[in-house]
Amino acid sequence: MPLLAEDEKEKEEAEEAPPAISYYQVKPSLIANLASGGKYIRCDVQLMTSDDLFLEELNTHGPAIRHALLLLLSEQDGRDIKTSTGKEGLRKKALSTIGDLMQELSGKNELKALFFTTFLVQ
């Protein structure tokens, strides 16, 4: 009977374990002219998911993801995205844009978050 108790304990621990997190890095760095003219943005983006199959979908649709992000970045005003509030707004908009795109292309959206790991406006 003690063996059964150990099996139950292991099963409970496995159920309580947080899902494995994976990241998809949009490569190479994104560089786009800003709508405000004369300025550009350079940034690196990481997409977080807890679904390994969805990670493969992100890889498959990498060019479409990159294109959508470049279009979104080129619509931005440099003054707005220099503030932390502006960056957070852009992050949320980018997450929504990529989530909608993945829903359209793969039939699901398993994105958990989007992170800017480099962010430069000049």
Regions from the language model: what does each represent?
Residues M1-Q122:
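Flexible, low-complexity charged segments
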